[in-house]
Amino acid sequence: TCPDIIIDYIFVDEAQKLTIKNDTRSLVTYSAIEQTLNLNPNAKLFFSSPNLSNPEVFNDLFNRDHAKVYRSIEGATAQNLYFIDLLNNKFSYVDKNKLIDIDNVNQTYTSVNDLIFQINKGKSKIIYTGGIDNTLSRTRDFLRYIKKLQSNKKPQNFDLASQVREFVHTGYELAEAIEYGVAFHFGNLPQAIRDLIEYNFKIGNIDYLFCTSTLLEGVNLPARSVFILTSKKGTRYFEPVDFWNLAGRAGRLAIELAGDIFCVKDESGTWNDKAVKNLILSNKNEIELTPSFYLNDSKRIKELEQIIKTGSTEGIQNSEFLRTLSDMVRIDTLRTDKANNLPLINYFRNNGNNDILHYALKSIDNINIPTHILLANSHIAINSQHNAFNCIRNYSIDELKLSWNPTNEEIKEKLALIFNIYQIDKYSKGLNRLNFNSIPYYAVILTKWMHGNTLSEIISDAIVYYISNRKNIYLSDKTQEPFDQNNSIHITKLVNDTIKDIELKIGYQLQNYISHYCQLLSLVFENNPGANWSQFIEFGSNDPIVWQLQFMGFSRHCAIFLKKNFPKHLKYDQENNQLYILNRAEIKSKVKQNKLYWLEIQALL
């Protein structure tokens, strides 16, 4: 936060994310809005959300009295909704929340690939498949299907495919799929590749887009047809608001009058009767939501109380959500000057949960970290922050501070220190938790990432590591095989795992700990706390020119590309921390149209 900045307007798009149950991201979003409002009490607050019958819930959440609410039930295009049960050869369409059978079509389509290929042939199609593993297997299966039909490759996509091979790896399966007008899309893809896929889907170079729920995360990508092959989002069933948000991608304004939504059951467990009733036959205009921290289950309230009292999450499902919520309650009880006006405190007080507030206040008696640091780091357990704060005082600044040009050995040493003082193995929870034994691996990735290595270089090094150490690759069905660099499935799995580690474990989890560590160093040792590695991670470089280019709006990959290919055009004034770009027209002219960097450079130079 910066006290010199006054915010007059706050716009919250996709506001339904504040209501996602057992999702810590909803709590982080709430906290960011609430803190911004506390610093800017006169700011005007705007929410937008699809398919919601009680939009006033967002104003109530933040105690906004006399707020105006507008609700529309009109869609941009008409939509036709179908349910196709291939296991029982039943085809139906939805009319007034009822399934109406369609006769004489069950012999036309024998597989889901028949449906995807033949229905609305020649029109754009989004195929929702659930998780990443399903997305990849469905893409592979469809690619085999169209090859058997002797479908031709699309020459206009050859350049796109070569860019994917250059940016990621020659064996990455996405490249071959794109040559046939097919692509997959999920959160672990590099943003540059996602942008490339979305752009080429919009202009018609990509016809079939297999995806996860990433398309629910604010990506505006409509299509003529949307195929929904499962009622689940990850391991959980869709909430109606998510289902209709995804279905709303069907129909392209100003291109056609209607869009089609096909919910297809071709495997057991993808669509059961309950999902059909709660989703397909639900009224999208009558969806009511409640904020994620409104706990209506007495068991969950008791579990929250247990975590606050004991600090233990043992035996609790979705414990990371309740742990984060418990810390938010504890922090808010510290904010004594604001406590009477804080929505979180008011909610528990008004619902008769004063015991929770009592235990929360009692649990922070010995916490002496400044409130502003606790508020900025709710994703790190308070007890973990407290332990680190106390441990740091036992070291000298020379033992703690981080260097500006770290070696792999220094990174390993400092990561081990951070793991120990934060007790990360104790407080890090979940399937994707950090692990002390993986520090050598984290250090290798961190070293390359912070020194500006490209993704393809990092991937190539990972492949060499797997080969030289005769490592196994873990596949989607929980089996493992000796890694084979000539197996495109192995390459794709390794690429996706590496990108996930860069973005999640390095770029989010470790960055959060390192950022907090640097905040504590600045607090305890006021002079020269050393380099801030969290900035190196955020920018993916320790080069100030690459930083400055990203400040201008360029992505990491594009900033590194410009630094590498046009160094004479980039003049950095170190004294004033200012970057000057010379001969912009020449740079634009030398970057080939439709290249990975072309759109960015044309827009920003």
Question: Across the structure, where does each feature detected by a protein language model lie?
Answer:
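Conserved C-terminal RecA-like helicase domain
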Residues: 1-2, 112-208, 223, 232-244
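SF2 helicase catalytic motif II
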Residues: 2-39
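A short beta-strand element within the Helicase C-terminal
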Residues: 7-10, 208-232, 244, 259-264
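Structural recognition of the conserved hydrophobic beta-strand(s) that form the central parallel beta-sheet
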Residues: 11-12, 43-50, 208-211
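Conserved segment of the helicase C-terminal RecA-like domain
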Residues: 42-43, 221, 232-281
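Conserved interdomain linker/interface between the two RecA-like ATPase lobes of SF2 helicase motors
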Residues: 42-143, 183
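C-terminal helicase module of SF1/SF2 nucleic-acid helicases/translocases
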Residues: 257-350
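C-terminal accessory/interaction regions of large nucleic acid-associated machines
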Residues: 306-340, 359-605
